[in-house]
Amino acid sequence: MVSRLEHPAGGYKKVFESCEELAEPIPAHVSGKIPAWLSGSLLRMGPGLFEIGDEPFNHLFDGQALIHKFDLKDGRVTYHRKFIRTDAYVRAMTEKRVVITELGTAAYPDPCKNIFSRFFTYFQGTEVTDNCSVNIYPIGEDFYACTETNFITKVNPDTLETIKKVDLCNYLSVNGLTAHPHIEADGTVYNIGNCFGKNMSLAYNIVKIPPLQEEKSDPLAMSKVLVQFPSSERFKPSYVHSFGMTENHFVFVETPVKINLLKFLTSWSIRGSNYMDCFESNDRMGTWFHLAAKNPGKYIDHKFRTSAFNIFHHINCFEDQGFIVVDLCTWKGHEFVYNYLYLANLRQNWEEVKKAALRAPQPEVRRYVLPLDIHREEQGKNLVSLPYTTATAVMCSDGTVWLEPEVLFSGPRQAFEFPQINYSKFNGKDYTFAYGLGLNHFVPDRICKLNVKSKETWIWQEPDAYPSEPLFVQSPDAEDEDDGVLLSIVVKPGVSQRPAFLLILKATDLTEIARAEVDVLIPLTLHGIYKP
């Protein structure tokens, strides 16, 4: 799965350029044959505006939210995109400056206000961004674009129009939710976010949003906290980007990347800082795994520990013979990977990009195994008895269980990230195949497939082509797990008059089925969904 290419021409810089929205959908030029059954919409979220006037955004996740849609019907394809009318976007465009602080970019006071107005504004507290550039998912019959704060934005998936901003704090006891919910076949949504728990200590709540009911009432109004995980540090919650779910359990990985709550509450009013200034790493903590029963929701007080790593994306988790198998995309060590995702770093020339990646945490796909039946008298013993894995779990004298992983893939500065599976059939179940975006020194330059049982790999790659997260769509008459297609938006700037396309690959071997080229450049997209 290691990249075969170098990128001295720097074409990857094009995915970090601002674009304009489209007034209406544009036709795509199709080559190859799109399967007749593939009829629906690929909806993607990402940053589309990287500066406001003369003020640049600093971090990859600061760019203003742009929703993309490829419509597929009867072998024809159209492409459309619009900026989400968030408060962050509308006010920035109106005032022609950054108005709301983003992850790595601070908003500064309006120079037209006098000193007393600015002083009053500071001590009112900073506005939390609603820049929903990370993902989109359904709640009931509605679709919401999201980031990781308490705000989500309802959008029309057909017209891409913005409908309304929703504050999750009006429904749930959370400070925000991740952009990676788990969604069951009936439409039930599960997610995780930090909150204030007992004795004003920080904690993490798993929340449940029910499916749409017959009376068509708002599912958010019936949402509830299902179970709570304690925090390892009272006032420093870990950064949480995703979580795991099996048929009967939730898996939460607590990493040493922390949010310093005191800095978070005071930094803007005192120093005009941004969110990134509030992160710090606990180099003594390592990484903790937490488990909870799903129904009824109950915390399981087993103390699983392992060496330090960053985790953004879970691949899958499943139960087998009294064990929970957890497959993750990890980054070794306690340093925060987001420190390397500033736009100034990502836009550097190829040799400089490679040098920066040498200093960054190194990626690795890992499998951990957590035993459910634990006895203190088994000290020093490996509790894992599954025959197909080398992962271990050893009982220690202090009652903790030390985990060592099985490495499923490792390549120097070669990441398997933005993982996807046949979610509708195999999420939370024993599975074989994972699909992902290959990062070459942080540059996305290939699509990958991994057999998690045999470790066999496949890749799709072209020179000067920069794909996005591949989404799996199952064939309607599928019998095998990987019977379907992968959809990915690819940017290929080069000399072509059509610098971007929707790529359709056969999921079994990553051979190309078709592509739908458009005559506009498409900036980086992060996550999305396929809507039949």
UniProtKB/Swiss-Prot annotation:
Entries under InterPro entries matching the protein: Carotenoid_Oase
What is known about its processing and modification? Palmitoylated.
Which top-rank group of organisms is this from?
Eukaryota
Annotated keywords: Cell membrane, Cytoplasm, Hydrolase, Iron, Isomerase, Lipoprotein, Membrane, Metal-binding, Palmitate
List required co-factors.
Fe(2+)
- Indicate the principal place this protein occupies in or around the cell: cytoplasm
Annotated binding of Fe cation, by residue: 180, 241, 313, 527
- Keyword Ligase in the entry? The reply is no
Catalysed reaction(s)?
an all-trans-retinyl ester + H2O = 13-cis-retinol + a fatty acid + H(+); lutein = (3R,3'S)-zeaxanthin
- E.C. number: 3.1.1.90, 5.3.3.22
Entry annotated with the keyword Cytoplasm = yes
Q: Where in the cell is it found?
A: Cytoplasm; Cell membrane
The membrane topology of this protein is: Lipid-anchor
Q: Name one GO molecular function term.
A: beta-carotene 15,15'-dioxygenase activity
Family designation: Belongs to the carotenoid oxygenase family.
GO cellular component terms, A-Z: endoplasmic reticulum membrane; plasma membrane
Record's cofactor remark: Binds 1 Fe(2+) ion per subunit.
- Protein name (record): All-trans-retinyl ester 13-cis isomerohydrolase
Tell me the Pfam families matching this sequence.
RPE65
Q: Which GO terms describe its biological process?
A: retinal metabolic process; retinoid metabolic process; zeaxanthin biosynthetic process
Give the UniProt tissue specificity note: Predominantly expressed in brain. Expressed at a low level in the eye.
Organism expressing this protein natively: Danio rerio (Zebrafish)
* Function of the molecule: Specifically generates 13-cis retinol, a stereoisomeric form of retinoic acid. Capable of catalyzing the isomerization of lutein to meso-zeaxanthin an eye-specific carotenoid.
| Lipid linkage positions (S-palmitoyl cysteine) | 112, 329
